[in-house]
Curated annotation (Swiss-Prot):
Keywords: Erythrocyte maturation, Glycoprotein, Membrane, Nucleus, Phosphoprotein, Signal, Transmembrane, Transmembrane helix. GO terms for biological process: erythrocyte enucleation; erythrocyte maturation; nuclear membrane organization. The keyword Signal applies. The lineage of its organism: Eukaryota, Metazoa, Chordata, Craniata, Vertebrata. Residues 1-43 form the signal peptide. This is Nuclear envelope integral membrane protein 1. Together with EMD, contributes to nuclear envelope stiffness in germ cells. Required for female fertility. Essential for normal erythropoiesis. Required for efficient nuclear envelope opening and enucleation during the late stages of erythroblast maturation. Residues 336-405 are annotated as: B. It is a multi-pass membrane protein. Homooligomer. Interacts with RAN-GTP. Interacts with EMD. Phosphorylation may regulate its interaction with RAN-GTP.
Length: 444
């Protein structure tokens, strides 16, 4: 190790102050070994660090320490951008992520915790280390397990479609949570998915119901829960390999457990209690907010979108309110425009359309069960004419149509104009005779 101290131990010659003979030499040897271990654990360690650059591949064949410095300030368009350090090797390697060079020096120093944690760390030949957009520096240590291992390290900054899909899923759960909680398709599909993914957790939960209280078996059950979660994580990481090698067993498991989950969901049925539906709705909306926050890499933009979503969901149509308010303000600032008057032709057409519509509504009401036929017939003078009207005949007789044409038709309009002109001429003649009569009166 770099910076370590090698201690050479020579046999003792003759008796010393720490003892005599063989016993004294053993004591001195033990103290020297312990002091050497102490110096090895506390000595300053010089770490050879390779600085990584984006999109530049660094290839190594030995254990090495790497650091990446993020100098770019995140912008609003980086909400779905992810920075990752990819380590791809020909054989299994162990990757340890730390914050800075000081932590790398601590990894090089001997400690009981580092010794045991090295056995617990997962060994992979292709791994990704996520780097935060606001993280200034990220360091990692790559340790090879076998000789002749070749690996490459590269920093990737790219648009991550997974983040975008997680954000869309959060939007859907938040705005459609009330609809999904009442949907039978969502109920059965969610039940089957939970049954397939968490079958071990469900089995452990069922077994815990049959265990007596204050039993030491609960310790085993807690360990079973942790082991089940670890197995689920391991299966998802190696899902492609499992499908390629054991697709028959995986397909049989999915079909069997899926059918059993569907049977259990069918037995209990969808939620019917309104309070249970509300609880499921709130749970889905809370999950949607969490997905929305985790799907955006910039925290303050994520919080702003969550606040907008809450306002849009809880306030009744705030955009429509804002539009109506702006419209009223603009109308108040402008001068009122007088309404446009209808022409004679438009007035006639509108009257015919509205009359025809009102007559059709009257026929529908008379044919409906709400209309009392006997009471209606007893109040009208011509029941047969009313019956013909209800069956689709005209509401006017030919005589009434001719009278209407004479009064309001084209000929009647001309006659009215002539009468108006005659009346106006008579008024003018009477006005012209009035001054002469007045003058004669004064003369007499």
């Amino acid at each position: 190790m770099a910076g370590g101290m090698k201690v050479a131990v020579s046999p003792a010659v003759g008796p010393g102050p720490w003892g005599s003979g063989v016993g004294g030499g053993g004591t001195v040897r033990l103290l020297l070994i312990l002091s050497g271990c102490l110096v090895y654990g506390t000595a300053e360690t010089d770490v050879n660090v390779v600085m990584l650059q984006e999109s530049q591949v660094c290839e190594k064949r030995a254990s090495q320490q790497f650091c990446y410095t993020n100098v770019l300030i995140p912008k609003w368009h980086d909400i779905w951008t992810r920075i990752q350090i990819r380590v791809n090797s020909s054989r299994l390697v162990r990757v340890t992520q730390v914050e800075n060079e000081e932590k790398l020096k601590e990894l090089e120093q001997f400690s009981i915790w580092n010794f045991f944690s090295s056995f617990l760390k997962e060994k992979l030949n292709d791994t990704y280390v996520n780097v935060g957009l606001y993280s200034t520096k990220t360091c990692l240590k790559v340790e090879i397990i076998e000789k002749d291992t070749k690996y490459s390290v590269i920093v990737i900054r790219r648009f991550d479609p997974k983040l975008f899909l997680v954000f869309l899923l959060g939007l859907m759960l938040f705005f459609c949570g009330d609809l999904l909680s009442r949907s039978q398709i969502f109920y059965y599909s969610t039940g089957m998915t939970v049954g397939i993914v968490a079958s071990l957790l469900i089995i452990i939960f069922i077994l815990s119901k049959f265990m007596p209280k204050k039993s030491p078996i609960y310790v085993i059950l807690v360990g079973g829960w942790s082991f089940s979660l670890y197995l689920i994580q391991l299966v998802f990481k190696n899902l492609q390999e499992i499908w390629r090698c054991y697709w028959q067993y995986l397909l049989s498991y999915v079909l069997t457990v899926g059918f059993m989950s569907f049977a259990v969901c069918y037995k209990y049925g969808p939620l019917e209690n309104e309070r249970s539906i509300n609880l499921l709705t709130w749970t889905l909306q809370l999950m949607g907010l969490c997905f929305m926050y985790s799907g955006i890499q910039i925290p303050h933009i994520a919080l702003a979108i969550i606040i907008i979503a809450l306002c849009t969901k809880n306030l009744e149509h705030p955009i429509q309110w804002l539009y109506i308010t702006c419209r009223k303000v603009c109308k108040g600032a402008e001068k009122p425009v007088p309404p446009r008057l209808l022409t004679e032709e438009e007035y006639r057409i509108q009257g015919e359309v509205e009359t025809r519509k009102a007559l059709e509504e009257l026929r529908e009401f008379c044919n409906s069960p709400d209309c009392s036929a006997w009471k209606t017939v007893s109040r009208i003078q011509s029941p047969k004419r009313f019956a013909d009207f209800v069956e689709g005949s005209s509401h006017l007789t030919p005589n009434e149509v001719s009278v209407h044409e004479q009064e309001y038709g084209l000929g009647s309009i001309i006659a009215q104009d002539e009468i108006y002109e005659e009346a106006s001429s008579e008024e003018e003649d009477s006005y012209s005779r009035c001054p002469a009569i007045t003058q004669n009166n004064f003369l007499t």
